[in-house]
Structures are given as C-alpha cells and as structure tokens.
C-alpha cells in the first residue's frame, strides 16, 4: 500500500512541478508509526529541505525498496529517494547527490548465544563474509534489493541463494530480527543503529546481540539522495545539492547521531565533519 503526504509551501505560484519523495520504512531513519512517528533522522530532514525548495509541490510517498527502484528507473515522473547508497549499477539510471549523510557501515548481526558457530570466520573482531557464505553453513536475512555497500553486495551476488532469506515487504529489518530470534535465521545483515532500534521495540536487550564488522569493509559508508536520471531530475538535483551542502552538517548529522549508542556519538560527529570537509 502506498501512503501519500503533501507538503504545501505558502505563497508559492501555481503550476509547479511535483517532486515525489520515495520513503521506505527504515526505523530510525524513517518512523512511520508508533510513539516516535516522524522523529527519524530523514523524517526530520524532509520538512526542512522541502521548505527550502519552493519551486516544487512536494509529495512524500511510502513505498518498499522494489517499488522505489522501479519508479526511479522508469523516470515517468520526477522522483527522488533520500536514503540511497551508491552502486555502479544504479548509477546507470539514477543521478546521485553529493554525500548527504555518513553511516556506520553495515555488518552481520547475530545472537550472542549463537556466536560460536561464526568463530571460525572471525579474526580481530571482524568476520570474513566471503568465507562464511562460501561455507554454506548458515542462512542470513537480507532486505531484498537493498545495497549494503560494494563489498557486501558483491559477496551476496556470488552466494548460493539457499544461504539467503530475502525480505521484500515493509518493516523488513524488524521482521528479519524476529526470524533470527525464532531460530529461522542464523543472523542478518544490516546497519547496527537500525537493528538496535528494532531490538528495543521488540523487547530484546541489545546486549543479547553481537554486531560483527565485515573484514575489509570501511568504518563508514556515504549515503545520498538519488533522483530519476532525466532533465527534470538533473535540475532538481542542482537545487538539492545547493541546500544539502548546508543541511547535512547543520541538521542531518545531528539527527542521525541521536540514534547511535551514546559512546559513539561524539567521535561520530567529529569524524563526519572531517569527511564532509573533504567532499
């Protein structure tokens, strides 16, 4: 089901083009329901960004990843997604913004009681995902059509499909965590801040889970806004880049930091400032 929300801009001229923002249910980046609805990092960014782009009528559409990719790729209407990782394949049909937000890289999340089955593949606190998947000894949950970064994506593409459980629906991360808790999965790939949030919502102590960084993966990943690669999309991206050069530091990185473990927040904010100064 698609949910539509319109953002009106006062005193703007008529006959403006509609810009549709494609939002997925990815707590705590976006929070579509519950007591903290609308308080996700991207939720808080959207009204600020859209208010600074009065050239458009802005529509927020709730979709899953598969539908978002379909709309971006076909380019029939001007659409943008504010929660994208860059991949070479996507860049053929999608235009990307400047980096808008820095994420701690995704990794493997397992229950602490099951850590032993992964130990042969762990060295210096990091897991060799390629060797793990080649062993065909575990079944991991992933969100269908989601990018986890180049190294992980390549490994998944080369893995036997029987070792993966792909989730296509809404609340994918929460559902995969439930499956792991029930013993139907050995673990799931994901971003720790998302899984930590879902664990708290499900009454799971995050201390019962272990986040394993992927060997040879960078500490951080860059996230972007992606728009349809059309003349209209290119024009919208010029305006998005203009605004996000300011908003990524003045607003968004703080919105994200509040969802991190408290001991990570200060180092994250310092690191992100250095990263953005180079971009």
Could you tell me what each predicted segment is?
Residues 46-54, 133-170, 199-205:
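Ligand-binding cleft/hinge of the Venus flytrap
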Residues 17-32, 39, 123-150:
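Short loop->beta-strand "edge-of-pocket" segments that line small-molecule binding or catalytic clefts
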Residues 73, 82-93, 153, 186-208, ...:
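A ligand-binding cleft/hinge motif common to bilobed small-molecule-binding domains
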Residues 43-53, 110-126, 134-135, 139, ...:
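Extended ligand-binding regions for polar small-molecule ligands
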Residues 60-134, 213-216:
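Acidic, polar ligand-binding/catalytic clefts
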Residues 24-27, 102-107, 203-241, 266-269:
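Periplasmic-binding protein-like
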Residues 52, 61, 66-79, 133, ...:
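Short helices/loops that flank or line small-molecule/ion binding pockets
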Residues 15-93:
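Extracytoplasmic small-molecule ligand-binding "clamshell" domains
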């Amino acid at each position: 089901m698609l949910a539509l929300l319109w953002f009106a801009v006062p005193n703007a001229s008529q006959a403006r083009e509609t810009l549709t923002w494609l939002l997925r249910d990815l707590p705590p980046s976006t929070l579509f329901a519950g007591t903290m609805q609308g308080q996700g990092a991207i939720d808080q960014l959207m009204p600020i960004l859209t208010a600074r782009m009065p050239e458009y009528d802005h529509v927020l559409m709730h979709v899953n990843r598969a539908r978002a990719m379909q709309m971006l790729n076909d380019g029939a209407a001007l659409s943008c997604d504010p929660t994208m990782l860059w991949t070479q394949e996507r860049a053929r049909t999608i235009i990307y913004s400047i980096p808008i937000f820095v994420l701690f890289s995704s990794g493997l999340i397992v229950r602490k009681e099951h850590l032993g089955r992964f130990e042969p593949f762990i060295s210096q606190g990091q897991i060799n995902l390629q060797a793990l998947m080649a062993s065909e000894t575990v079944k991991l949950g992933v969100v269908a059509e989601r990018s986890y970064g180049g190294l992980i994506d390549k490994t998944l593409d080369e893995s036997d499909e029987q070792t993966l459980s792909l989730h296509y629906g809404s609340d994918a991360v929460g559902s995969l965590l439930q499956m792991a808790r029930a013993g139907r999965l050995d673990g799931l790939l994901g971003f720790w801040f998302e899984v930590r949030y879902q664990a708290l919502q499900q009454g799971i102590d995050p201390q019962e889970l272990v986040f394993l960084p992927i060997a040879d993966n960078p500490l951080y990943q860059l996230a972007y806004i992606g728009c349809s690669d059309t003349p209209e999309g290119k024009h919208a991206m010029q305006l998005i880049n203009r605004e996000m050069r300011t908003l990524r530091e003045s607003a968004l990185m703080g919105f994200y930091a509040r969802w991190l473990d408290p001991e990570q927040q200060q180092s994250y904010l310092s690191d992100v400032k250095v990263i953005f100064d180079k971009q």
